[in-house]
Amino acid sequence: MAIYMVIFKVSKVLFMFFIFLSASISIANVNSVEFRFSLLSALSKNSEAIEFYEENNFKPIWVGRDRSSRDRSSYFFKELKNTSKHALPTLRYDATYLNNQFRKARTATELGLVEALLTSKFLEYSSNIQTGILKPASVDKEIVRKIPYRSVGDYLKTFSSVTPREFFKGLHPQSKQYSALLTEKKRLEKIISQGGWSSELPMELLRPGDIGNEVVLLRNALIKRGYLKSNFSEIYDGNLRRAVQLFQLRHGLAPDGIAGPATFSEIGRTAEERLASVIVALERERWTNFDLGSRHVLVNLPDFSTKLFEDGALIFETRNVIGTPVDEQRTPEFSDVIEHIITNPTWNVPKSITLKEYLPEMQEDPLAHDYLELVDLDREIVPRSFVDFNEYDEETFPYDLKQMPSITNALGLVKFMFPNQYSIYLHDTPSKPLFDLEVRAFSHGCIRLQKPFEFAYELLKPQTSDPKAQFQEAIATGEETVVYLRKPVQVHLIYRTAFVDELGVINYRRDIYGRDAAIYEALIQAGIQAKSLYGQKLKKTG
């Protein structure tokens, strides 16, 4: 028995010796010249990462044997399991391969390579989940997002100075929109796994009071989509009408309770198509993962709406008209600052409109658009009788056109200025009937507001006790007047076909410009697996 005890003690001592030796070798490995050379070689194309390691005496983030390194690597591998949750390109990070390489590394050279590999994947993942997978302008030049990308050094320094949990928890967008979109994504994935919404739809327009099998088809479709409780009635009753109206409201349709082609078209969208919209919206949220401003304006182009928020609360909203879905007239996406308001504005007709639209018409009829003044290079008004329009073409026409202030001015009585390279602004319009339409894409790119006066009052509230009086006084002059905002207001022209409204309810809109379809295809090319998983592409609608 004593012999066995001796053998046991010797074995224990040897075991502890080998553990100590292994740890010593590991420590020596990460402090060796070989480790540094391997790390530097693997990071040779990332000068910022090299600078970080040099500043920290090449102390490893991942492969050290201290507890902090173990916590970082363990939490990072855990975090990579959530890539599909956020609709990120899972295979791009290849967590299984990373983990295998991490576990197999023994020599200084191997540890240096793994340290560099984990750092590279960490930086890629962090950037992707925080500020997006794609570069917006590479998908569509009209998406002009100035994304506040973080530097490599900032990522590495922050990650090294806080707990992994704290770092990763705050990485993805913290907005209400992003959180709700993740919930909707999960819901849609469950629906798809159960076979989707496949259901036969009616072939004819249905109204309240109608009776028959077509009504049953409509009812069943709305039951499957969660708008009605199970019911087998063949009558288009009040409950069905309210369900149709609710569906219409949440899909940007006139809530008239009549099920026609537009309503059937939206009901007919598959769960896969809706999921594609959500995936794109998640990427778009990552592009705008910055402070929108305590007081800011959101112009959602597919929703044809303009909203003013203050401290997270909606304080004003109005319908709008956006650019037509043709080249050079689509409204771009960007962020800026509303600096001032101009009442009784003069409309200086953009040169492209003058040459492409008005010049041909004036060549046929010199009095066409006679409400527009001809302006020469000296900014003097020239009588039309002095000009032979047929002497010129697009390249030689020397005049500009402008419309003087009036209630019939194309800009109405007020415009809201955020000076930008696209000459885009918000403005009034004399064409009020357009706001009654569902699809309101009729402008040359600028945004027309249904309630511009009320919008002006809200913008002026922080700087005057009587904003209405101040604004109306400027209007009453009949002359072009500039009213500056003492505190400029951020304005964001966004494009969301899937979003959450102020009640926390998911809404969907048509892809009026086809931008989401292009983004979805680009995401597929970047490696997200939605196409293979869900089998459908996002269709352009409009």
Model segments located where?
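Bacterial N-terminal signal peptides
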Residues: 14-22
